[in-house]
Curated annotation (Swiss-Prot):
The protein's name: Large ribosomal subunit protein bL21
Family matches, as HAMAP family: Ribosomal_bL21
Family, similarity comment: Belongs to the bacterial ribosomal protein bL21 family.
Record lineage: Bacteria, Pseudomonadati, Pseudomonadota, Alphaproteobacteria, Rhodobacterales
Subunit structure and binding partners: Part of the 50S ribosomal subunit. Contacts protein L20.
Pfam families linked to this entry: Ribosomal_L21p
């Protein structure tokens, strides 16, 4: 049986035991993660997602992709050349299980990308100054 999952803006066709290179996830090596955005699993096709389906995986390592070099040269300007390189950060995951139902009750943490913002804790409001303290500061 196979599934099609979506993570990092890309879609992957996976089976149990497959090793994938996906966009960087907030997980350490050895952690178990769960992909909840399943577009298709077995013969069930979602519209757009299959309800209750999930793909579980184990994080193997965080790696960097091959370097992509960009070379910029502007005509008619002497010594106006620039070389830049970029290495995309990736996470290696091994698919362990395909769940058609009950993915929301499995207890495994969901796979979250590195750029996803987590809501900050609510900070307590500062105590307001009394009128006497405020007027004392204005006098100084």
């Amino acid at each position: 049986m196979f599934a099609v999952l979506k993570t990092g803006g890309k879609q992957y066709r996976v089976q149990a035991g497959d090793v994938l290179r996906v966009e960087k996830l907030n997980a350490e090596a050895g952690d178990k993660v769960q992909f909840n955005d399943v577009l298709m699993i077995g013969s069930a096709v979602g519209a757009p997602l299959v309800a209750g389906a999930a793909v579980q995986a184990e994080v193997i390592d965080t790696i960097k992709a091959d370097k992509v070099i960009t070379y910029v040269k502007r005509r008619r300007k002497h010594s106006s050349q620039r070389t830049r390189g970029h290495r995309q950060q990736l996470t290696l995951v091994r698919i362990t299980d395909l769940l058609e139902k009950g993915g929301d009750k499995s207890g495994v943490k969901p796979a979250v990308g590195a750029r996803t913002k987590i809501e900050p804790a609510v900070k307590p409001a500062k105590a307001k100054k009394s009128e006497a303290e405020a007027s004392a500061e204005d006098a100084n």
